Structures are given as C-alpha cells and as structure tokens.
Amino acid sequence: MFSKNKHNTKFIVIACVIVVLILILFCLDFQNIQEIIETINQLTNNQNPSQNTASEMSGMRRKIIFFIFNFFGKIILASFVISFLLHIKKNAQIKRLKNKLSLWSKLSFHVSQIGEEVLNELPIGIVLIDISSQEIQWLNPYASFILKNPEINSPLAQINENMAQLISTSDAIPKTIITLENKKFECFYKKDLNVFYLFDATEKEQIKHLFLQKTLALAMITFDNLAESLIRYDLSEQSQIQGEYLSALSDYIEPYEGYLKQLIDDRFLLLLNRQNLDKMLENKFIILDTIRNISYKYQLKVTLSMGIACWNLSYEKLATYSQNAIELAQKRGGDQVVVNIENEKIKYFGAKIASLSKQSKVHARINAQNLVDILKKHPHCFIMGHTHTDLDALGSVIAFYKIATTIHPESNNYIILDEEKLDKSLIPVYNQLIKTEAKTSLNIITTQQASKMIKDNSLIAVLDTQTKDMVNSPELLSLTSNVVVVDHHRATEEIIPSIFSYVESSASSTVELLVEVMGFLEKEVHITAFEASIMYAGILIDTNAFIYRTSSRTFEVASKLKDLGADAIEVKSWLRKDFDKVLEINKLISEMEIFMDRFAIIQSSEIYENRSFLAQVAEGVLNIRNVDAAFMIAQIADNKIAISARSYNEINVQTIMEQMEGGGHLNSAATQLEGTNIKTVTDTLKHFLKLEYEKGEKNMEIILLTDIPNKGKKHEIIKVNNGYGNFLIQNKKALLADKTNLAAIKQSQMLEQEQKRNHELLMHKLKQEIDDKKITLDIQLGPKGKIYGKITLKQIAEEFLKVHNITLDRKKISLEGEIIAIGIYPVDVFLTDQIKATFFLNVTERKSK
C-alpha cells in the first residue's frame, strides 16, 4: 500500500512539472505567438483576400512552422533533460540496492554460520519434542552429550522426569534446575516451539548455594517458667540448677559455631549461619529433650522455646521476625522451636508435653479488664466461632454474648450462626436452644444479615479459633478492623489480626477462659441452666471428659457451671452415640492398621458428613493398650478427605497435622485435604510419622576433617558410635554425614581436584621453560685447580633468576653431588612429586683482571 501511494505521488509530481514547463515555454514565446495571432487577424480582416500576396501567406506559414518546431523542440529537450536526471537517480538507487543485497548476502552467510555454531558448538543444549507423544524428535550435539546420547523418539519422561513435568506447568516461561552427573543445568521450555533449552548453571548454583549457606539466622531463646519454678529453692540451689540449664544450652550451641549472648536471666540471643541452622534442623533440636530431662531430674516445669528467623533482610527486620517466632512458640505453649526461613513454610519442632500454664489470677484479671474496656467502647458486638460449630464453640459464643450483654444491657449484641455450617451432632441442641432461650435466640443472626449490619465502629469477637480459614464467616472480618480473639488452641502463623487477643493454650477450653472473665466483672452475669449446660458440655468435649489439658482451674469453672444449673445427665444424653454408630465404630476399629507398633490408622472409603464421628472413632481406639496415637481417615464430602487425630501426652499430633495443612492441640488435632485420595493421604501420614518418631541407629555416619589414626583419612566417611561421633564433631575433627555436609565435602573435593589439575598444567609449562636452560658461575680456583668455598643452592637460584627471570624454590633444587671442580653439571628441579625439570650449570674459572 505504501509503495503504491509513493508511485502515484511521483506521477502527479512529474505531471505538474510538465504543465509548469509548458506554461513557462508559452510565456517565453509569447511575443512570437502574439505576432502570429496579429498576422492571422490581418489576413482575416482583409476585405479583399485576393490582395494577400503569396509571399505574406508563405511568411505566415513559416512563422507558424518555426513556432511549432521551436516550442515542441524545447519541450522535447526539457523532457530529455528530465529523463536523463531521472535515469541517473534511478541508476543510483539500483546501485544502492545492489550494495544492500550484497551486504545482506554476506550477513546472511555469517548469521547462518553463527546459527550453525550455536546449534552445534556452543554449550547450549537444544531438545525438540513432539508435544502429542512427548517424545524427542531432535537434539543438538551438546544436548545429546549431557543427556547421554538418547535415541530419537525416546519418551522424554524416561530421559529426565523434571523436564517432562515442565510441559504441563502453567508458568509463562516454564523453567527448572536439573542435575546431570554432578552438574546443574538451567532448563527452559518454550511452549510455542516445543523446544527445551539447557544451560550449564553449575557455577551459578554453587555461588547461590554458598550465599544461602552464609545467610544470617537470628534466634531468640527463652527458658519457659524458669523464675516461677526456681522460687522454692534457696539462692545457691537456684544458681546450681540455672547453671546446669545454661551449661546444657552452651554445649549444644558450640558445635554449630553460633554466637550466644545472654540478655536477661532466662532470655538469650543466638547468631549463626544457614549452614549450621540446617544441621540443627536435621537433628530436630535435641536441646529440647536435654532441657526436659534436666527438668524431670529436679521435678521442675521448665522447658525451652526458640524463635528462629533466617532471611536476607536488614538486621532490624530479621530481629522482628525472630521476635514474632518466639512469641508464636510461647502462644503455642512453649517447649518448642519455631523456624521461619525465607521462601519456606514455618516449621515447628518439639512440644512433646502439654502447655505449661503461666496463667495466674492476676493475669486473668488483667485480660478481663482489657476486654471490658474494649467492649465499653463498642456497644454493638457481633460474635462468632469456628465453622462446623460444635458444643465447645457454641458454649464459648454464648458465654461471650452474656458478657457483652452484661456490659451493655441496652445495646443489641448478636450471635452469628448459620444452620448449614453447624456440626450435625449439634443440631438437636441448637433447636432446643431456640425453643428454650427465646431472648438469646432473638439475637442469633446469619452471616448474610450480619454483613448488612456491621459498621466501621462495630466489634467482631472470634472465639475458639485464631485462624481466618476456620472462622464461621471470614468475609465479615474485612468489614471492620475492630476484632478481638479469645482462644485456647495453639497458634499458627496465619492468625487473625486483632486489637485484643486472649490466647492461653494451657487452658482446657475457651469456655474456661470466658467463665473466669465473668468473675472479674462489676456486675453479675446471668446465665440460665440450659446455657450453663451447653458451656459445661463444651469443657467436657474439649477435655475428653476431664482427661486432657485439665487443671484445678478447669474444675473450678466446671464447679461454677454446676452451681449455675448445668445438668451433667442432660449433657451426657447429648453425647450418647446411636446404636448404628457404635456398630460402625466397632467395624472400623476391627479393620484398623497398627503402624510402627504404636500408631493406629483407620481408613474408610465411606463419606461421613458428621466430622465428630471421626473424632469418636479415634478416641475409641485410644482405649486399646499400646496405642499411643490414633488417626481416622475418611471422606467427609466429594473430593474432600479429613483426618481426626488423638494421642496421649508423649505424642504430639498437632505438629503432624500441621505438616498436613491442619492444626489443633497436642493430643487432639485434625486436617482437611482436597484433590487427593485415601491412599495418598495415608502414605503421607506414614511418611511424617516415620520422620518424627522412627528410632535412629545407635551408630552415626561422620565425615572426617583430619586424619584419625586407626579410623580413617581426611574426607573419608566412617561409621562410629554416637558418643564418639559427637566427641569428634564437638572438637571440629568431623562433620555429621548429612546431605548438606556431604554436598559441601564433595564440592570441596571437586575444587581441590580442579586446583590440582591447574597446578599440574602450570608446572608442566614451567618445566618446558626450565628444561635445557644454561647458567654460568665464575669461580675462583686455588693453586691446584680446586674451588675455593662451596657453590650453594642459593647462588644457583639467584643466578637462574638473573639470567632467565624465573624464580626457583631452592628447596626443590637438587644436585647429584658436591661441585668441586670446573665443568658442566646437570641441576634437577622437582616441581611436584612427578614433574622434574633439568637445566645445566657451567662452572668456569674467574679470570683475574
């Protein structure tokens, strides 16, 4: 289109030039034209034409013919000039085009050569596949070399599974790192061309790994309950016990080359790098067991908690992350380590005993006062528990509603409950509540109603959970920033942001915390007998009939609820099982699997919509001797599988469930998983149980850092007993043979071999420069031709440097014997054990002047 418009423009310009030229010629010949016209007029106006002589007519014809020839001659001449100029211009354009074509031809040749070199010579692997069959169609020589010469039409999955997985990824530019014979390759997949590109990234990954290993980790360490536990001892005993704790902590840190600084009596700061942190992770922080054993020895309730952050951030932010981690560890009950590593999910270690209660009456009173102050500022309160509301959640919701109503009797406070979100076992109790407690039931609203009523200054109370995903109505949390949380579960990293949080993981239930708060209010809280029964049932369920997480304060709260009219018989009737359920539980238990001689795993392909039934099965299995933990696995809906876990004190099912995207308490926890099946979930559960509880061997594998007589050489991997192995590790004579250290030693050996090869090449080159060279030393001779003094190796080295500008180590120079006379002597230079160079020394007599 552009070319056509350009051609039309040229034509118009030329036509305009011709028209202008004709007009100019007319102007130039205007006088001649005027004369011809006058002559014609005279001849025409002559009344007697016969009088027009032949000569006049002939003259007129000559003028006209001359004018025509003159006029058109000029036009032809001008056209010729224009054509000539256009011809020159066109030839110039043709010449330029020929030059461009020649240049393009040369460039095309070079580009073709470069492309061929890229395909065949440069270290870039290129693999072309058939997308339908996922088979290799073509690959360049470098790709063939690194992939070990695969045959054409070979399935890609057989050659490298990681490459095959890139085909189905949804990333815009799928890429991954693959390992091929100790080398790392960056692999890119270009979807539109069905081509893989492989680049050697070994050095890049090594640098990245080294940088990662040197990343700073900051840890906050606290001894839980130390001051409270030591208060009954005298000063000397306190110093002795505290010294034993500190000594154990110091001994634990020493092999990891960390910097330990005591901040106050029970709080410490630890600095170390990522490499040593990984070793701690592999050993699962055995310091927790050591501190627990010391506490058991003195009958103390002292444990250790650590919060570790390892991020490539400023020190200030890193310290904040570490502080958040230690706070999370303490919210979860202490006796554990919380590790927050960049780009990794938060890890939890320890927590093998129930949470130690730090709560005192003073602590409860302070929290009660803070809660009252907040409620006074916000007269309109919306209260909700967790989804799949059960008796413990309902009891805590009612308890908080009663507290809010007591503080603001004239205001409307609301309980948010959706019938479709209730646990099926709760529906009969809920229906009875609606009938029995008319005043309370009037203020029960749905999520949809609440969304229209909540304002910016409204208050939302979240009870019996801290996790946004577990809340009955998570969408309501965005309607106001005024949120309070009261819970007794161990915290996770995904806690709900709040203006006030009262979390006590050592409490039996949220009901226990709220009933204690009632005792510190200025006004008496009016609770009906039926409401007290619901709260009592909540405690009963959370403690499994006062077995787990039960303290004297739990019984105080239960006693108070009994005084308020709680009916234990009615509660028992709510918790009774149907006959069909009992048969189903017994059937499932009869088919259970005992794993690792201590864990019961029950599976069912049936769909159980009632989640509490799964918990009942797990709790029933715990009554069997030698079962330390029970896991009930079943479908609760299409494409959704749940695990209900129960255990005794020594097994922490919470940490197991957290690794499977769940949570809970030390002895009762659960999770829900989507997009999987029973077998996969069971295999995953067994994997985590093995990692956590499988007993290690009495011997350990270590990597020697120096030669040990009768044991092995440097970098050798040997197996020794744990005691001797730990001794060598603490004295920095060995490293634990874990994946990190093995990789580091392998990398060190590869580096040493590379350096050795480079050194040998350098020595061979130096040998070539030294061989057959000659130097001369002029020596003064005695009367009988003997040499005065002695020719030293230092003299030889200095003379060689002077003559040939090569520095020799005189310790590596060797002579066959002592030089005692003039002559030519061979001199050997031992560059390495296997490389020897030889030059010649000419000893001559010094001429006297």
Curated annotation (Swiss-Prot):
Name by which UniProt lists this protein: Membrane protein-large ribosomal subunit bL9 fusion protein
Biological process, per Gene Ontology: translation
Transmembrane segments: 11-31, 64-84
Keyword Membrane tagged: yes
Taxonomic source organism: Onion yellows phytoplasma (strain OY-M)
Keyword annotations of the record: Cell membrane, Membrane, Ribonucleoprotein, Ribosomal protein, RNA-binding, rRNA-binding, Transmembrane, Transmembrane helix
GO molecular function terms listed in the Swiss-Prot or TrEMBL record: rRNA binding; structural constituent of ribosome
UniProt region (Large ribosomal subunit protein bL9), positions on chain: 681-849
Membrane topology value: Multi-pass membrane protein
